[in-house]
Design a protein with these regions (language model features):
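Conserved, well-structured functional cores that handle cations and Mg-NTP chemistry
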Residues: 1-122
């Protein structure tokens, strides 16, 4: 419910953005990711295993977060969370699931990772 409310509120705020905050009439959406550690519980270890470089029982579970926000309003539009390692767990893998929130003509502003020529969002 909180996720749905966040997306809906972000979308409503984004639609009310002042035109001077648009780039050539286009909405600009920011995308970025980060990693976070979390408490060492059995549930967290199962969903977000600690890196294999850490000894068992010594490290913490790690998750990767990716968020899309509106440049004009600062509103959070959507986010994804996944394990820190494994197939499809990188920022690019997670952001693919967020592309449904982009409209034709929107501009994605992101760091150099997203400029990787082997990544095609469409």
């Amino acid at each position: 419910m909180v996720s749905a409310l966040t997306r809906q509120t972000g979308q409503l705020l984004s639609q009310k953005a002042l035109t001077q905050w648009l780039w050539r009439g286009r909405a600009v959406k920011l995308a970025d990711g980060t990693g976070v550690s979390m408490p060492d519980t059995a549930e967290n270890q199962a969903a977000y295993p600690q890196p294999s470089s850490q000894a068992a029982g010594v490290g913490f579970p790690l998750a990767r977060l990716v968020m899309v926000s509106c440049l004009a309003t600062g509103a959070a539009l959507d986010m994804a969370i996944g394990p820190h390692q494994g197939k499809g767990s990188g920022e690019l893998g997670l952001v693919r699931g967020l592309l449904k929130g982009f409209n034709p003509g929107d501009v994605m502003l992101a760091d150099a990772l997203y400029g990787n020529t082997s990544w095609s969002p469409i």
